[in-house]
Regions:
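C-terminal amphipathic alpha-helix
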Residues: 14-17, 31, 35, 90-133
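Short, Lys/Arg-enriched charge-dense amphipathic segments
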Residues: 23-31, 36, 56-68, 117-124
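Immediate post-signal-peptide N-terminus of mature secreted/exported proteins
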Residues: 8-55, 132-133
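Mid-chain, structured segments of secreted extracytoplasmic proteins
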Residues: 51-94
């Protein structure tokens, strides 16, 4: 997937704005599809290793999926998603597309994907450390 920004003077079309939104959604879907099953399997392994009941598991594993750092990643991602969606709609609806705005949207999408990758890395590192104990 190319995240390079085209120069603002190169011209852009309304469809380019919609494409940025679609690309962000696709990137996130792909990342979740790649990471979620592996992470869930590690959670199951931890539950089995510790011999937790389902109730214990829900309590003990909670910090692995929700802590201050994960919440910060989620807040950053939500803000970026809103910015991308809003900018995509605004850019697609404009009489004359603003190519500088398109570059900003592409940069936001890149940051969003990086933020989610950092979140998955952080969560995976946490659960790997627990499995190693």
């Amino acid at each position: 997937m190319s995240m390079a920004c085209a120069p603002a003077h190169a011209g852009c079309a309304k469809a380019d704005f919609e494409a940025v939104v679609d690309e962000a959604a696709g990137s996130l879907r792909d990342m979740n599809a790649a990471n979620k099953p592996k992470f869930q399997e590690k959670l199951r392994l931890l539950k089995d290793k510790r011999g937790w009941t389902q109730e214990q598991f829900l309590h003990e594993a909670a910090p692995l999926v929700a802590d201050d750092k994960i919440n910060t990643f989620d807040l950053q991602s939500t803000a970026l998603l809103e910015k991308i969606a809003s900018g995509g709609e605004t850019g697609a609806a404009a009489a004359k597309p603003d190519c500088a705005m398109l570059d900003t949207l592409r940069a936001s999408m890149k940051t969003l994907v990086e933020t989610q990758a950092e979140k998955w890395t952080y969560m995976t590192t946490k659960i790997d450390a627990e499995l190693a104990r």
